């Protein structure tokens, strides 16, 4: 029962519902008793299930056939409807609803769409799996843009999205799903709820999933489409129009899919090209997503802590050379070999941390990429910076772990903050020296 669970409980209590809640973690339970006034904390084994109308699951509680939580089994045995905060939100908000899913880029796309719509005069709010519990979002907005995970999509029933977006589908969460086909099917549930679908035809899994969809706007970052949105070589192409996307605050290469999808959604809602392009240029991006945090001499530091899969790391590497790459953590299925087959020549050296360090070392050795065991982010930053600055060439120290953070950190934000703190400690003397010289 994290932030989403707390916001769900508080919202339902305020609406007048009788709410029962539970968390297996005793420390969390103790804290939440103080935060959630009006809620009864009762173990599910003591529920009178015939009196319960719905079981609302927090994100991450396993509920798929191959990996089912004990409480889900109890609810199913009692014939109780199992739902999520997102479904409750969607059926209670009379506003435009835009849902965004995919393996990589969801949060940035959600925030970019919201950024564009607000600048177009469409009062909008973002939420969902991005870290803002949807039931705590302010009411009365003209549009809500929601990040939807595969878990949330599986629990949704009878939802009506004005626009649904699929950015990409690459291997992820295969510790939860029995195979890739099940993961794709979970993502594909957004098709059932979308009046208009915006989909990446350049991604093979997404293209196959959407091949029989009627009302759809396609986008591609690999070829120019006769119909749909294309982002190529720093330009957006749509219905015979061409717009330059230079001078962005975010990296255009790694954010090409996010830009294309956001453009398509905004156009579908009637936003002008002028407003869209001006908004994209001013969008500041999100923390922990290919975020430039400092530049010292010839070295740029980039915090990409959110990159927990090989496919997301590839987006950071595609626009950079001479990379001193900090990688590792709690490994996911797929490893890093797909990255190395394409981008090994961009990596000057890898600095390995966390549980996956030994496994990654084997892959790097096969690809003939130099690497060193650092075990934690602080040491990795220190060593990588020393080697990068000694190289005398323009270089990037990149935290892009290709792993989850749960071996050493509470979440990817905490890991990214640790990287930024280590960088700040290094950068401070150089800034002082630079100021003194001037």
Curated annotation (Swiss-Prot):
Belongs to the MurCDEF family. Pfam families: Mur_ligase_M (PF08245). GO terms for cellular component: cytoplasm. Gene3D superfamilies: Mur ligase, C-terminal domain (3.90.190.20), Mur-like, catalytic domain (3.40.1190.10). HAMAP family: MurD. Pathway: Cell wall biogenesis; peptidoglycan biosynthesis. Its EC number is 6.3.2.9. It is found in: Cytoplasm. ATP binds at residues 102-108. Cell wall formation. Catalyzes the addition of glutamate to the nucleotide precursor UDP-N-acetylmuramoyl-L-alanine (UMA). Transmembrane segments: none annotated. This is UDP-N-acetylmuramoylalanine--D-glutamate ligase. GO terms for biological process: cell division; cell wall organization; peptidoglycan biosynthetic process; regulation of cell shape. GO terms for molecular function: ATP binding; tetrahydrofolylpolyglutamate synthase activity; UDP-N-acetylmuramoylalanine-D-glutamate ligase activity. Keywords: ATP-binding, Cell cycle, Cell division, Cell shape, Cell wall biogenesis/degradation, Cytoplasm, Ligase, Nucleotide-binding, Peptidoglycan synthesis. It is an enzyme of class 6 (ligase). It catalyses: UDP-N-acetyl-alpha-D-muramoyl-L-alanine + D-glutamate + ATP = UDP-N-acetyl-alpha-D-muramoyl-L-alanyl-D-glutamate + ADP + phosphate + H(+).
């Amino acid at each position: 029962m994290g932030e989403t669970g707390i916001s769900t409980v508080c919202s339902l209590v305020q609406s007048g519902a009788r709410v029962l809640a539970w968390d297996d973690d005793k420390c969390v339970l103790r804290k939440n008793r103080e935060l959630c006034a009006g809620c009864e904390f009762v173990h599910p084994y003591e529920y009178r299930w015939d009196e319960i109308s719905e079981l609302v699951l927090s994100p991450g509680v396993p509920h798929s056939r191959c990996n089912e939580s004990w409480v889900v089994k109890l609810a199913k045995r009692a014939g109780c409807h199992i739902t999520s905060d997102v479904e409750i939100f969607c059926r209670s908000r009379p506003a435009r609803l835009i849902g965004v899913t995919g393996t990589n880029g969801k949060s940035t796309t959600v925030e970019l769409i919201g950024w564009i719509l607000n600048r177009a005069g469409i009062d909008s709010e973002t939420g969902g799996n991005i870290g803002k519990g949807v039931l705590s979002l302010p009411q009365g907005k003209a549009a809500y843009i929601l990040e939807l995970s595969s878990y949330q999509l599986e629990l949704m029933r009878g939802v009506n999205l004005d626009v649904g977006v699929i950015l990409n589908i690459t291997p992820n969460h295969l510790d939860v799903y029995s195979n890739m086909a099940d993961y794709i099917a979970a993502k594909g549930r957004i098709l059932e709820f979308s009046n208009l679908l915006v989909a990446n035809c350049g991604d093979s899994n997404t293209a196959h999933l959407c091949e029989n969809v009627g009302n759809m706007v396609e986008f591609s970052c690999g070829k120019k489409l006769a119909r749909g949105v294309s982002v190529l070589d720093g330009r957006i192409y749509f219905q015979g129009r061409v717009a330059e996307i230079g001078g962005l605050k975010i990296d255009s290469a790694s954010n090409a899919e996010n830009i294309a999808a956001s453009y398509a959604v905004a156009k579908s809602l009637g936003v002008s090209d002028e407003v869209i392009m001006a908004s994209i240029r001013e969008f500041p991006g999100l923390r922990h997503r290919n975020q430039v945090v400092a530049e010292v001499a010839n070295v740029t530091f980039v915090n990409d802590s959110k990159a927990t899969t090989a496919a997301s790391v590839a987006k950071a590497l595609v626009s950079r050379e001479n990379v001193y790459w900090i990688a590792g953590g709690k490994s996911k299925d797929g490893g890093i070999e797909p990255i190395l087959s394409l981008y090994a020549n961009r990596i000057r050296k890898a600095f390995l941390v966390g549980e996956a360090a030994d496994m990654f070392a084997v892959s790097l050795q096969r690809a003939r990429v130099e690497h060193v065991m650092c075990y934690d982010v602080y040491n990795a930053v220190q060593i990588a910076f020393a080697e990068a600055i000694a190289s005398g060439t323009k270089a990037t120290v990149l935290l892009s772990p290709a792993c989850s953070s749960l071996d050493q950190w509470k979440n990817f934000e905490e890991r990214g903050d640790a990287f930024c703190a280590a960088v700040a400690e290094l950068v401070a003397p150089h800034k002082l020296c630079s100021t003194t010289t001037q």
